[in-house]
Amino acid sequence: MSTVDIDSLVEQICSLDLCKAAELVDKMEQKLGFPKGGLLTAVPAAGGGQAESSAAEEKTDFSVIFDSYAADKKISVIKAVRECTNLGLKEAKEFVEKEGAKELIEGKKYKKEEAEEIKKKLEDAGAKVIIK
């Protein structure tokens, strides 16, 4: 690849919305064989005890919990779930129709900003979402 191609690729990646960027990261992790959750979960943190205590004080990884949805908004909720995950139409429909609260992507942790954006997108579609 030439430098021009790389620059173009960088521009395309930077123009992705948060859900599509998360989908890209998931696919790249799968393609490259990274452990689920990324490399940082496999490598112990370096540094003194002060860094560890400040990390314990402020939560940085959040789960997005899909709780329920408004019955009249079912189609838009399914579309939003598909947009925020790698699920196909059938899987997204089954996910939405499944009773009870469940993680949007099981075991997937999001940064606070990303979790808030996903929550807003799903709530705008008619879903009730919890961030833990």
From Swiss-Prot:
Entry keyword set: Ribonucleoprotein, Ribosomal protein
InterPro entries from the UniProt entry: Ribosomal_bL12 (IPR000206), Ribosomal_bL12_C (IPR013823), Ribosomal_bL12_C/ClpS-like (IPR014719), Ribosomal_bL12_oligo_N_sf (IPR036235)
CDD domains, per the entry: Ribosomal_L7_L12 (cd00387)
Molecular-function GO term, any one: mRNA binding
One GO-annotated biological process of the protein: translation
Keyword Ribosomal protein set for record: yes
SUPFAM superfamilies (alphabetical): ClpS-like, Ribosomal protein L7/12, oligomerisation (N-terminal) domain
Gene3D superfamilies: 3.30.1390.10, Single helix bin
The keyword Ribosomal protein is assigned to this record: yes
GO cellular component: ribonucleoprotein complex; ribosome
Subunit structure: Homodimer. Part of the ribosomal stalk of the 50S ribosomal subunit. Forms a multimeric L10(L12)X complex, where L10 forms an elongated spine to which 2 to 4 L12 dimers bind in a sequential fashion. Binds GTP-bound translation factors.
Function: Forms part of the ribosomal stalk which helps the ribosome interact with GTP-bound translation factors. Is thus essential for accurate translation.
Family designation: Belongs to the bacterial ribosomal protein bL12 family.
Name of the featured protein: Large ribosomal subunit protein bL12
